[in-house]
Amino acid sequence: MTNIHPTAIIEPGAKIGRNVVIEPYVVIKSTVTLCDDVVVKSYAYIDGYTTIGRGTTIWPSAMIGNKPQDLKYQGEKTYVTIGENCEIREFAIITSSTFEGTTVSIGNNCLIMPWAHVAHNCTIGNHVVLSNHAQLAGHVVVEDYAIIGGMVGVHQFVRIGAHAMVGALSGVRRDVPPYTIGTGNPYQLGGINKVGLQRRQVGFEIRLALIKVFKKVYRSEDGFFEALLEAQEEYGHIPEVQNFIHFCRNPSKRGIERGAAKEAFQEESVDKEGALVES
């Protein structure tokens, strides 16, 4: 049963699904769609051609679907789509897109923490975490299972690869390869995200292959792209390695991140559970 508080303002034309909860002082504009089992908490504001997927919770004072913060925007019809079972926490801002027919898209099972900002034309995959005050500029792409730490700034058009983890306070100006971990401003890669991949039950042999490929590519004396070709010949049969190589060989206009910290090249050993550890 849908439960709408009498102080909520819901404009005629808004589409409200079944078992939706709308708390006090929420504002829902006329072109918004709330799918079944959505919860919108007090003072949230949802505008524009926005669709909120089933089971998603919008926390107090979040703002979704507002006019993009882009001077190029001239009132075109643009969209915001948020998937199922997401948590959009307090004061998060997800603006609409720029250019006719384009969409800001957030996948399923994402956590957008307080004060995070998702700008125009961003695309976020499934199971992504944006930590407190993470700031995505326009046209950023964040792939599945990536984690963006607190107070990170991501330059427009940058891509963050799947399963990457970007440490807090980082400034990211170039594409971050999948499966990597890093931090800093300027940003430096710290190697493969071993702990994250193990938690997601990525197999030992795959993790080890990714580590070897990363080291081959990032400390090669033959050149970055030449090393990618060598890695393709040796490990290209592994889908995760193939994804890493394809990502690095096809960067955005920002280019691929080449900086790597010294600790990224430490030798690896294995503990009694089969986990990779630094020696």
From Swiss-Prot:
Domain of life: Bacteria
The enzyme's E.C. designation: 2.3.1.129
SUPFAM superfamilies, A to Z: Trimeric LpxA-like enzymes
Organism: Chlamydia abortus (strain DSM 27085 / S26/3)
Subcellular location per the Swiss-Prot or TrEMBL entry: Cytoplasm
GO CC annotations on file: cytoplasm; membrane
NCBIfam families: lipid_A_lpxA, PRK05289.1
Keywords tagged on the record: Acyltransferase, Cytoplasm, Lipid A biosynthesis, Lipid biosynthesis, Lipid metabolism, Repeat, Transferase
Catalytic activity of the protein: a (3R)-hydroxyacyl-[ACP] + UDP-N-acetyl-alpha-D-glucosamine = a UDP-3-O-[(3R)-3-hydroxyacyl]-N-acetyl-alpha-D-glucosamine + holo-[ACP]
Function text: Involved in the biosynthesis of lipid A, a phosphorylated glycolipid that anchors the lipopolysaccharide to the outer membrane of the cell.
Official protein name in the record: Acyl-[acyl-carrier-protein]--UDP-N-acetylglucosamine O-acyltransferase
Region described as Disordered: spans on this chain: 260-279
Protein's GO biological process: lipid A biosynthetic process
Main location: cytoplasm
GO molecular function: acyl-[acyl-carrier-protein]-UDP-N-acetylglucosamine O-acyltransferase activity
Cited InterPro entries: Acetyltransf_C, Acetyltransf_C_sf, Hexapep, Hexapep_transf_CS, Lipid_A_LpxA, Trimer_LpxA-like_sf
Subunit structure: Homotrimer.
Associated pathway: Glycolipid biosynthesis; lipid IV(A) biosynthesis; lipid IV(A) from (3R)-3-hydroxytetradecanoyl-[acyl-carrier-protein] and UDP-N-acetyl-alpha-D-glucosamine: step 1/6
Keyword Lipid metabolism set for record: yes
CDD domains, sorted: LbH_UDP-GlcNAc_AT
Similarity comment: Belongs to the transferase hexapeptide repeat family. LpxA subfamily.
Alphabetical list of Pfam families matching this protein: Acetyltransf_11, Hexapep
